């Protein structure tokens, strides 16, 4: 079987927007729920991948890489309580204004609270761990695709907006094993424009 990108459209959009914004360094902690995004990143030589089995250590690695390189760094972990291990490092990143995009893969949010194993509520992270948090749902139609594109653009923008800091994406995944997609979709970069900024030419 040829191995390319996952067929999950929301993950494709995340990857395409990371590339379009020049974000390439990824620290991945192994797991089942984040398999689709990590495997797709490993297929693409654009991404500079680092592996760290312990999420607490991975978060501090991201702090160091962001501080030293000045680049935006991606963290990826599986579902369940593994994402909680990011919190000490993200707290440091929050107070140091380090641009770390934390992608926690997850089952559908409607399974939270119904005794599904390894399924936790990530809708309200502690106030001093991230500057913003977004849930990236599975894409079923054009409206879902638009919503996904806007949220991921917002998340990337938030990494450096008003001083910046860590941002959380809760990425819903079905755990698809179809890696037949050879090309990422074309995506639209949405730039934030504030007072005093120059609008792009029409």
What function would you assign to each model-found segment?
Residues 1-202:
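N-terminal alpha/beta PP-like core and its mobile active-site loop of ThDP/TPP-dependent enzymes
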């Amino acid at each position: 079987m040829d191995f390319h990108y996952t067929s999950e459209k929301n993950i494709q959009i995340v990857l395409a927007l990371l590339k379009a914004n020049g974000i390439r360094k990824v620290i991945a902690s192994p797991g089942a729920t984040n398999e689709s995004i990590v495997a797709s990143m490993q297929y693409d030589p654009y991404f500079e991948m680092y592996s760290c089995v312990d999420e607490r250590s991975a978060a501090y690695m991201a702090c160091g890489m962001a501080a030293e390189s000045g680049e935006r760094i991606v963290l990826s972990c599986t579902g369940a309580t593994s994402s909680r291990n990011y919190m000490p490092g993200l707290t440091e990143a929050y107070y140091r204004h380090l641009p770390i995009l934390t992608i926690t893969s997850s089952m559908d949010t409607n399974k939270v609270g119904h005794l599904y194993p390894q399924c936790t509520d990530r809708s309200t992270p502690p106030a001093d761990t991230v500057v913003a948090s977004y849930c990236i749902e599975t894409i079923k139609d054009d409206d879902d695709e638009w919503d996904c594109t806007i949220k991921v653009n917002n998340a990337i923008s938030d990494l450096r907006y008003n001083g910046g800091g860590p941002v959380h994406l809760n990425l819903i995944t079905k755990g698809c094993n179809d890696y037949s997609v050879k090309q990422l979709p074309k995506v639209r970069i949405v730039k934030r424009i504030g007072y005093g900024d120059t609008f792009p030419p029409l």
